[in-house]
Curated annotation (Swiss-Prot):
GO terms for biological process: translation. The keyword Membrane does not apply. GO terms for cellular component: ribonucleoprotein complex; ribosome. It holds the Pfam family Ribosomal_S8. It comes from the Bacteria. Belongs to the universal ribosomal protein uS8 family. Coiled coil: none annotated. Part of the 30S ribosomal subunit. Contacts proteins S5 and S12. Disulfide bonds: none annotated. This is Small ribosomal subunit protein uS8. It comes from Lactobacillus acidophilus (strain ATCC 700396 / NCK56 / N2 / NCFM). One of its GO terms (molecular function) is rRNA binding. Keywords: Ribonucleoprotein, Ribosomal protein, RNA-binding, rRNA-binding. The keyword rRNA-binding applies.
Length: 132
């Protein structure tokens, strides 16, 4: 079966594993998924991730993060720009997720970065997802 939106699949696998309180989840790898995983790690939403070679496209193993009492660090993930309806914004129109408590992941000419980094670099791009 052909996957039409691999980024939505990536976010859904993380959301489902998080809701089931799994320690980790394995996801087929791609460069944009590696970039998103790096952002989630840097912003403190996941513990870590590693890329394993499976003689095909590779697999990303994402290690989820929970609080001291088992509460979820990721409250929500939402895909914004979809294959059928792309969402591009200028640097001035970059969204703030929950008044700055969450992040927007933006694919720009400077790479895949957060909304805060895009504001600092004054670049717009495609809003990939919101994480809070």
């Amino acid at each position: 079966m052909v996957m039409t939106d691999p980024i939505a699949d990536y976010l859904t696998r993380i959301r489902n594993a998080n809701m089931a309180k799994h320690d980790s989840v394995e996801i087929p790898a791609s460069n944009i998924k590696k970039s998103i995983s790096e952002i989630l790690k840097r912003e403190g939403f996941i513990r870590d991730y590693e890329v394993a070679d499976d003689n095909k496209q590779g697999v990303i193993k994402v290690f989820l993060k929970y609080g001291p009492n088992g509460e979820r660090v990721i409250s929500g993930l939402k895909r914004i720009s979809k294959p059928g309806l792309r969402n591009y914004v200028s640097a001035e129109d970059l969204p703030k997720v929950l008044n700055g408590l969450g992040i927007a992941i933006v694919s720009t000419s400077a790479g895949v970065i957060t909304d805060k980094e895009a504001r600092q670099k004054n670049v717009g791009g495609e809003v990939v997802a919101y994480v809070w």
